């Protein structure tokens, strides 16, 4: 029973991380009808930015985290403006292939910038230790797993409020439902596309940190871990945010 509970805790932690990547997949698909294969690369880029700022430049970790996550969102926005905006009206398959090229470009740029060697992410809790853990009923729970699960739940709740209450959230929902109708109502669809990619970049950066934090490091395999969120999206539904979260429970099978 203890082994089962331990596997369940670790599986839920992975599911939380996968859900952050999966939400980015879904947001982009709902707004643009395109499956973006660049999400895993954005996760790795986000982790690389955080590591570079915190470890290489000695910037306090929490400041590095905020800057790294924000910059990843900006990179997502730049990707949409530079590569995807000119592709509006092109076949969906062509745009999806383009996102594969963007994925390769982002990862190659990151490798040339910070190198291929595994990298430490920095310690957000120097007093307690990122590698610390608590034991409850014979089950060991790492602090980083608790942080990852809590962060994912908080982000999902905030996104739900954002989509229901805020002006831009409602505009994003309208755009995902019918772009032409949204345009007729005066919604700036191009701005919504940019916002979607900005949010997707932020979600990916959070996931990238939790994938590479703790005992893990930022390496070539980090991309593969982020890519495992894709099956969860396919099973949960490419246009379903709740489905992306539920589908991420597939990470339990990985355990």
Name the predicted role of every residue range.
Residues 18-22, 42, 46-50, 64, ...:
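Alpha-helical transmembrane segments in multi-pass membrane proteins
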Residues 104-135:
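Extracellular/periplasmic helix-loop junction at the C-terminal end of a transmembrane helix
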């Amino acid at each position: 029973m203890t082994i089962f509970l331990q596997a369940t805790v670790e599986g839920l932690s992975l599911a939380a991380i996968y859900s952050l990547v999966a939400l980015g997949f879904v947001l982009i698909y709902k707004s643009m009808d395109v499956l973006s294969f660049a999400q895993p690369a954005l996760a790795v880029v986000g982790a690389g930015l955080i590591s570079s700022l915190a470890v290489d430049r000695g910037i306090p970790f929490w400041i590095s985290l905020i800057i790294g996550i924000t910059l990843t969102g900006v990179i997502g926005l730049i990707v949409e403006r530079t590569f995807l905006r000119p592709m509006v009206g092109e076949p969906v398959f062509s745009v999806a292939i383009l996102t594969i090229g963007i994925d390769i470009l982002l990862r190659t740029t990151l490798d040339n910038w910070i190198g291929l060697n595994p990298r430490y992410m920095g310690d957000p809790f120097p007093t307690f230790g990122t590698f610390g853990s608590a034991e409850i009923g014979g089950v060991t729970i790492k602090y980083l797993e608790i942080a990852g699960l809590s962060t994912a739940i908080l982000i999902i709740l905030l996104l739900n409020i954002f989509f229901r209450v805020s002006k831009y959230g409602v505009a994003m929902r309208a755009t995902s439902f019918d772009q032409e109708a949204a345009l007729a109502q005066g919604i700036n669809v191009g701005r919504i596309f940019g916002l979607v990619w900005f949010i997707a970049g932020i979600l990916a950066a959070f996931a990238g940190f939790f994938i590479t934090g703790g005992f893990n490091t930022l390496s070539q395999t980090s991309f593969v871990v982020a890519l495992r969120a894709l099956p969860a999206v396919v099973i949960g539904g490419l246009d379903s945010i709740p489905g992306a979260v539920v589908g991420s429970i597939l990470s339990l099978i990985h355990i």
